[in-house]
Structure formats: C-alpha cells, structure tokens
Amino acid sequence: MIDPDGYRPNVGIVLMRQDGQVFWARRVRRDGWQFPQGGMNTDETPVEAMYRELQEETGLLPEHVEVLGATPGWLRYKLPARAIRRNERQVCIGQKQVWFLLRLTGDESHVCLDHTDSPEFDHWRWVDFWYPVEHVVMFKRGVYARALRHLAPLAQGVAGQGVTAMPKSAAEAWMPGHTAGHDRPRKRPRSRGYWPKKAQGDVPPT
C-alpha cells in the first residue's frame, strides 16, 4: 500500500521502561539497530498495526504495555537512492509513519524476538531515551529526532528526570550535511493527544 506520493504507511514503536530507558534492537543478519516498526495493512488503523507489529517483533501483547500517546499526523522519511526499486509497478520512495510511545507494564521476560518464523531482530537492550537519534542508520535520524521530540513530554511525565532535553549531540546528528535521504524536520506544535481534533490534509485514519 503506497500513497500517490510514493510513501508507504507505517507505524513506529518507542517502548519505554519506567526509568525512561527505551527498547533498542538489532536487525537479523545486519549490524543496524532500530526501534520496532512495520507497514500498515490496507484495512488497519495505526493502533491496530502497532499492536500487531509489537507482537510480531517483540512478542509483547496489549496487556504488557500502556499506550502513553502518539505523534499527530504522519512523519516522513525518504529512502536512500540505492534502496529505491525503480522497476516496481508502484515505486516506494520512503515511509510515512505514526510513532507510538508505550510504557512496559509487564515483566521484560515476556519479550520474545523469535515469536514469528521470520524474526526481525536477534538481540535487544535498553538505552537512554535520545541514544537512538545518534545511532540509527543515517537516513532515519531526522524522523527519529522528530518523533522523540513529540513524545518526550509524555515520556517525562512518566520517567521525570530519566528523560532529559535533547542533548546537543543528538540535535546535530540528523542535521542537513550529514546525509541525503531524510526529511528536515519542520516545526510542529507539541501534542499530548493521539490525533488533531480536526483532521486537516493527510492524516492517519483513526
């Protein structure tokens, strides 16, 4: 499912402990680490896709987490040119995402990376809230910075001083000049709700 602009609808998941540390996982047979994420099916809402991806990639169920909030509207990133398959009938140039912040309420022993026949990850650990902005693959750093900026006030409401303001090193990690292939963040008002009260333009279905 690709939109007319070439973006595939997708959800991202920031899974957080009570102390503000977040779930960080290594992709199978690759050196790259990232948050759980995945594409939406045609008949799914973002919330439904989030719970499906959560179970597929981490083994966690809805009763193991609490949804603290989500980014309002879509956040986009572009794929690097080498990753775009130009010979496809529908060319995908990137992802448009809704990011969810979840608090782990169950025991972390419930995490199971080989829950499916084709696991996405082979290892995971807890890292500081802003760590992923500096360590995810370069073309995703912009969208990670935007997502975590939106979600930080919600995270601070749970973890308090466990989640600080974005450090300078993270703020600079995604800036133009480091790479091509990601969107430069636009200033958006912070929101504690799931979606804008009035849907304007291209916003996720509820």
Swiss-Prot record:
Keyword set, alphabetical order: Hydrolase
Record-level Gene Ontology MF annotations: pyrophosphatase activity
Cofactor requirements of the protein: a divalent metal cation
Location of the Nudix hydrolase domain: 6-149
UniProt keyword annotation of Hydrolase present: yes
Family to which this protein belongs: Belongs to the Nudix hydrolase family. RppH subfamily.
Annotated protein name in UniProt: RNA pyrophosphohydrolase
Species of the source: Stenotrophomonas maltophilia (strain R551-3)
